Curated annotation (Swiss-Prot):
Protein name: SART-1 family protein DOT2
Superkingdom of origin organism: Eukaryota
Tissue distribution: Expressed in lateral root cap, columella, meristem and quiescent center (QC). Expressed in young leaves.
Protein's gene: DOT2
InterPro entries: SNU66/SART1
Organism: Arabidopsis thaliana
Amino acid sequence: MEVEKSKSRHEIREERADYEGSPVREHRDGRRKEKDHRSKDKEKDYDREKIRDKDHRRDKEKERDRKRSRDEDTEKEISRGRDKEREKDKSRDRVKEKDKEKERNRHKDRENERDNEKEKDKDRARVKERASKKSHEDDDETHKAAERYEHSDNRGLNEGGDNVDAASSGKEASALDLQNRILKMREERKKKAEDASDALSWVARSRKIEEKRNAEKQRAQQLSRIFEEQDNLNQGENEDGEDGEHLSGVKVLHGLEKVVEGGAVILTLKDQSVLTDGDVNNEIDMLENVEIGEQKRRNEAYEAAKKKKGIYDDKFNDDPGAEKKMLPQYDEAATDEGIFLDAKGRFTGEAEKKLEELRKRIQGQTTHTFEDLNSSAKVSSDYFSQEEMLKFKKPKKKKQLRKKDKLDLSMLEAEAVASGLGAEDLGSRKDGRRQAMKEEKERIEYEKRSNAYQEAIAKADEASRLLRREQVQPFKRDEDESMVLADDAEDLYKSLEKARRLALIKKEEAGSGPQAVAHLVASSTNQTTDDNTTTGDETQENTVVFTEMGDFVWGLQRENDVRKPESEDVFMEEDVAPKAPVEVKEEHPDGLTEVNDTDMDAAEDSSDTKEITPDENIHEVAVGKGLSGALKLLKDRGTLKEKVEWGGRNMDKKKSKLVGIVDDDGGKESKDKESKDRFKDIRIERTDEFGRTLTPKEAFRLLSHKFHGKGPGKMKEEKRMKQYQEELKLKQMKNSDTPSQSVQRMREAQAQLKTPYLVLSGHVKPGQTSDPQSGFATVEKDVPGSLTPMLGDRKVEHFLGIKRKSEPGNSDTPPKRPKP
């Protein structure tokens, strides 16, 4: 900052005193300098303070930002810690839940163990009760035997005393027997008490055997019920008179064993596609159970997952019993266990035999296989029979061709009569005459066209000959010869112009006068055709018409000039006549402009000043006498091959892909010495069906296709053929033509129509007619009527058939105002 101070009176006095004496002046100057230094020091101090304040503020802002970042970091850490704590809590909860589940399972196991122990205790108590009962029964039996023995002894004592000695001896023997019996019984009781644990195991075994027997009985009962239900169903069908013909030839996808296991099984039609290979699916209908099918697929997936991978399989094993396999992906699928139904919708003989065997197994009967010795067994042979060959071959599907329904003329006539059509139109005698007149008109028009075409061709030939003479001769001419030829050409052009003018005068005289007017009034019906033909002749002989065809040809010429400018110096076999300068005469409402030729003198001047170049776009390039022209033509046609023509994909034809296969031309001399020392490499070249050398990748693809037996698809083959044909067309086409041969087609259409022009309109207008052979539209004709009323000269021209030449001064319609 600059410190501004107002000057005081004292300073003014000091300034005045400066001029009075020099010492005072010096003193004042010193004081001023000191003041200036002080003010500068103050300003510097002020600036320093400002800078310090700014630095202080910046430091404060940085500290604030650091605090904010620290706070954010702390918040993030806190949130992370919370998330970690939540995850830990969740993991703890999961562990607790798992522990609880384990405790529950333990409690359940303990309860089950307790129940099992209780059942075992009950079984032991039952066994003990049974053993005690048996011991009590044995004691009772011993007591009863002792009582009987004592009773018998008492009887013997009462009967007689004579036999006392015999009785005493008998008592001693009986007492010994009783003691022995009692000892045996006691030993048996001890053994039974010891074998109590063995009895429990015996009880468990007996229970399992009983359960198995009960399960077999239940299964046998279920199967018997199933067979009874099937028999009842068959009997009911036979009683009702219903047939199973609608199930004839149907295939059941499941085997009998799986169907019989589950009892009554519901079978449904398997989902199949309606169309196969663009035709109706005529395969056999199949029945399946959804649950059995899903279970079968699960089992197959499980078996496939169980297969071990990476195991060495000896493919060259000579064991005749071993199954030989090539690759696992080419293994044949397992045989399908299906059953076919016969014509009546029942099981076949083989299926019935299997059913009988299953019934016998269920009932427990022995299944003996009986062989019929009288039956002629099938002998296995190494060759197929005719029937087996027919089965082995894949049956071809018959293509269903659509047939057109024949028209029933009698039915159509009856319908027409019923609807009232054809009742009024009974024909007339003049139909034949009208047809003959129509054919005659068409013939006359055709002759006129052909004559005009021949005249145009003759004129073009004459002009081209003159041009050829002018173009070939000027190379080696003297000035005198050129002057003579110029005079001859001038005389020829003048004579041609006079002939044209005489022809026009004759036509105008023939088309004017009272007789011509009367003739035109009499032939008013054919005035449109006559008018068109006369105007057509006039335009062909005296005028030039600019059409879309001319613009199209001009565009073609410009394209070819841009594409191949180097062939301009080659002369063609046939040349077109030079274009004469034209001037616009009048413009018709249909968009065509009529142009007349100018004086021939101006044409001659222009021909002298400009050299006419031959047309290179219409005709083929001349080869000439030299070898370079022939080589160039062969190169353009594709018959001369500079390099190897590769067959394959475009990416495989790159130089980077063919390194080392084809050597470059450069550096041959330097490589000659190295190639002599090296061994010659063996190169195998394969060609495709078109004779082109295959690239290495394409050759490998072909070999792999042959090995695997799987070639490219139909669409790829068609694309490849189409690409090759396009390349062939590009090589063989003419320089002036396109691959679609549009120029050649244009010439063919002109030859058929016999006209030197073509109308390239997209659609046929009301006043035009289309040629049925070429499809091109002809020149437009004047439509006789329109929506606007005809007045004045236009009305007279229409009814009298006269075409007046418009004069610039005589115009009925006023000129249009220009748009602002």
